[in-house]
Amino acid sequence: VSPKPFASARSTSAQGFTFFPPELASQAEFEGLSPNGDLQGADELLRERYFRRIHGYPANASTDRELVALILEKARRIVSHPTRPTFSEVLPYTQAPFEELALEESLDEDPTLDAVEALRVERQRERRVRCVAMLDTSSSMAGEKHLLASVAVAVLLLEMPPEDAGLCVFSTGARVVRRLGERKSAQATVLDFLRTTPKGFTDISLGLRKGHEEAVRSGSSARSVGILVSDGRSTEGDDPLPLARRFRTLVVLHLDGPGSDLAASQALAQAGGGTCLVVDDFADLPRRLYDAVRLVLRR
């Protein structure tokens, strides 16, 4: 039995005109996409290789490796210096004799600093944060948007430790591309994402459910955060708000444009205890995902 749709696939404006969601128009236009169009922020060689692939040119391991390498190169220009959040812990000197002396804490223990066992040192440790990204791969994400989304995926993989980055995709269905705790290479993950053909409608609730299930499965839901990449407009499925509330923190990257619903994206972020970052130009998606990951790591 099909689930009750949360939003109608066809809507009527206040003026009485009937319009269809972007998925329907994009599905019809997908085969006609031209590799001669404009793609801001992407190298021409990258763009050429991508469109040759989706237009049916023979693909093999060599051409796939070349395309993935170009995507990762593009991502590295955004993630120039990966950052890792840290926190300080104070330990007895005898446990970590090569760390920096914590003078104030040592004086509290022994004002004379004569007793070695009273000395304290400070050590920086990496704070583990696990992140599940959920990307819309409906028909409205076809072509150039799919290419830019693959660069955004690469940004996530370069910025996060391998075992702390999970990736789900959703449209009419949903699947996990990379599991939390899995040490799948960035190259294999990007290629797997590229093999996901954008199609179908947008079921945000299904994407959120799949992402949260992955966080629970990994046993780290209490310290996992979600990043949802969507235009906020569900065209099928259930109300996504109850699913957003399951996350400890949910950051929403709102893809602004015709037919998008900023208010819905903001409501999802609020329900998930996070924030909504607006992507005004789709070419900015990789960098805005970088901003989102850095925001997540600082929490």
Regions found by a protein language model. Give the residues of each.
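Extended, charge-rich low-complexity interaction segments
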Residues: 191-208, 280-298
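Short, hinge-like loop/turn segments at secondary-structure boundaries
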Residues: 183-187, 268-271, 294-297
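Von Willebrand factor
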Residues: 126-182, 186-229, 233-236, ...
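VWA/integrin I-like adhesion module and closely mimicked acidic/polar interface patches used
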Residues: 232-272, 277-280, 290-291
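Acidic/polar low-complexity segments with low predicted structural confidence
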Residues: 1-128, 185-186, 286-288, 292
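Short glycine/proline-enriched coil/turn segments at helix->beta-strand junctions
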Residues: 111-114, 129, 161-162, 246-249
